[in-house]
Amino acid sequence: MAEGLETGSFGKKPRIALTGMGSEHGEENAMEAAKMAAKDGIDVYYIGTLEADGVTTVKVADDEEGHKKMEELLASHEVDGAVTMHFPFPIGVSTVGRVVTPAKGREMFIANTTGTSSSDRIEGMIKNTIYGIIAAKACGKEHPTVGILNVDGARQTEMALKELEKNGYDITFAESARADGGCVMRGNDVLQGTPDIMVCDSLTGNIMVKMLSSYTTGGSFEASGYGYGPGIGEGYEQLVMIVSRASGAPVIAGAIRYAAELVKSKVFEIAKKEFVAADKAGLKDILAARKQMSKPASEAIEVKLRQKRS
């Protein structure tokens, strides 16, 4: 009861593992993050060599053993989720980052930041949108706004998403802060956090998280935000959050809190509902039609290459 009054949490505490070895800032940085998150009513399992009050240490000799131990804890359901610096997600699964934007201090989800939603760039960005909506809804945004970063494939992604909306999928598009508006976002929209979810490819998203978390430190120490986020994909139900080797204690603690929030809101139940709703609105048909449209162009390129060789 006393702990509940102190932390404001009376339910079952989320159990989150953290692999502490391998950081550019040493184990002490990771343990500092574990202690910070533990004060917020989270059971933190620190995988490494250090110990501290309020944190459960799982002793390992090195980073490789730490990863094996993390996977064991996840497989046995001894923990509800994990925060780590690298993880081999399967194709179809990618991570949704969460940052604090500088202009107005608004939080923004970056969909996506690591992993590969699809080998096709535009299909990947369409799927990233669904993954971003899942993460945002799990963090309490009932109708999150979606913006598409003005990168290669943005317009094709917009067309597919608007067709999905027309077919009944619940999606709310953000309006760019620029005078011409629209849901395709520019650089000032990134800085202002115009949409709740910024859709892009994972390489661009990775750079955005890096810049928005470490622009005040020169890049060697990620000081703000929640890291690169959880791996999300259809049928995937293992909560693994990604931080980088440059992530400082505030970001790692943010990632642990992000994980705890997803556990409490039952993110994978939200994901199931969202995928059903998207499929009902014809997501698979839209993706198949898009692939068919891109075939003639790729076949023409192949013919030209053959002609050059002959």
What are the residue ranges of the model-derived segments?
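Short, glycine-rich nucleotide/cofactor-binding loops
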Residues: 16-28, 115-126, 242-249
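Glycine-rich phosphate/diphosphate-binding loop of Rossmann-like nucleotide-binding domains
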Residues: 26-29, 37-41, 45, 119-181, ...
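Flexible, glycine/charged-enriched surface loops at secondary-structure junctions
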Residues: 10, 140-146, 170-178, 231, ...
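Active-site rim loops that border cofactor/substrate pockets in soluble metabolic enzymes
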Residues: 60, 64-68, 157-217, 289
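A cross-family phosphate/adenosyl-ligand binding-site feature
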Residues: 39, 45-74, 150, 168, ...
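N-terminal phosphate-binding or glycine-rich loops at protein starts, especially the Walker A/P-loop
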Residues: 1-50
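Glycine-rich phosphate/nucleotide-binding loop
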Residues: 101-118, 192-284
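N-terminal glycine-rich phosphate/adenylate-binding segment common to multiple enzyme folds
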Residues: 55-110
